[in-house]
Amino acid sequence: QPESSAASDVYKRQAIPPKENTYGKTEEVIGNWFEKTKKRSEVILATKVAGPGLNWIRGGGNQYDEKNLNEAVNGSLKRLKTDYIDLYQLHWPERKSNFFGRLGYQHKEEHDWNKFEDILNSIDKLIKSGKIRYIGLSNETAWGLSKFLEISKIKNLPRIMSVQNPYSLLNRTYEIGLAEVSIREESGLLAYSPLAFGYLTGKYRNGELPKNSRMKLFGDQFLRYKTKNGQLAIEKYHEIANKHELNFAQMSLKFCELQPFITSVIIGATTMDQLKTDIESVNMNLTSEVLDEINEIQKIYPNPCP
């Protein structure tokens, strides 16, 4: 692909790290590419609506109610220069819950929340209007996914088609509860952070911090990848890749791809070379020996970076 391709344009201009004055910029870049190339019909387009917590989005209108969902969808359609979105995802739960790696769930009565049907009704109207085609969740729990699926079945409302949650060699917590729901209910995982912010490429080994890398740009925002057990696990996985003469990043991605509950693996890249390397992982084979060795490391260092 030439350097002027959509992937190149997006990776050169994407808003990383995201800030108040850059949110929505990636949609604009993609929208400009659609307008220029007329290739919208060749692309499966997914985007998200932000939940509570970012008060500068839509003037603080972060609830998943009909008004804010309509405003968010219309804003995305305008930036993307299209009249429909294939997959529209709720970025994180509106209710109080454990997501973004949070542990130690503590429930309180004031945290009771039961807007599943209201949200699905609003989504149903958006689907019937033709503005979106399918609905997905992100950073969701097994209970949340199950409740959405239950309500959609009872009320004949749109069904959750996917869940975009983190999954990698360093964070396999999805297997604990959500994997079974994904398989039985055919609501597959779109795995994000499969390379654990780049740690599973080996580029941060020995304390290295490459210029323009995510950890350089984000600073101390993702310290969970720097834990002692996380670093030890990374070294062990790196040893497996070296032993079997595998590219470390490709091995990490392929492991995710092989899981039966995964629909797709979301990759990110800073350069076209990185993008090509990531894509080539689809042609890699992982032997049973490699998979056994990976699982042994998981037993020693279980989910060190949730």
Model-derived regions, located:
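Short, acidic/polar
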Residues: 5, 65-79, 145-149
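Glycine-rich anion/phosphate-binding loops
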Residues: 23-28, 62-72
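Acidic (Asp/Glu)-rich catalytic clusters
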Residues: 33-44, 79-81, 127, 149-155
